[in-house]
Amino acid sequence: MQVYGISLGYPIPVPLLARPVAAGFPSPADDFIEEEIDLQRLLIVNRPATFLVRVAGDSMIGKGLFNDDLAIVDRSLEPQNGDVVMVDVDGERSFKVWHRQGHRVSLAFANPRYPAFNLSPSAVVEVWGVVSASINPRRRAQRG
């Protein structure tokens, strides 16, 4: 699992179109810009507690995390039921869906192809952080 720090320089404003775009037939009247959004402010709430991790595998596709995505993990967030967390279970780091009922914690895969994840009562669980967002490059930049 590759973990990356975050280097923030100047803001990165990106134009935001005024209207949402349908996934069907496009409207030529919807091409004006409403405002600009700074991707750093949108994706990173607490910089000192945030890092990036490259996703490996397909166990979390039901939560929108795909192989080779970059997960944005925030250590300052307290996990809530249904959150995707980066966790260390008995020395093995992975992403799981978090559930807590009283003092009992359960972790789950988000892919029906995987069997249920059984957390033994003696398991040592350390939450590294909550996945607050992810980056899914649809097309990788060509490097030469």
Language-model segments: residues:
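Short beta-strand-centered aromatic/proline hotspots
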Residues: 83-85, 95-100
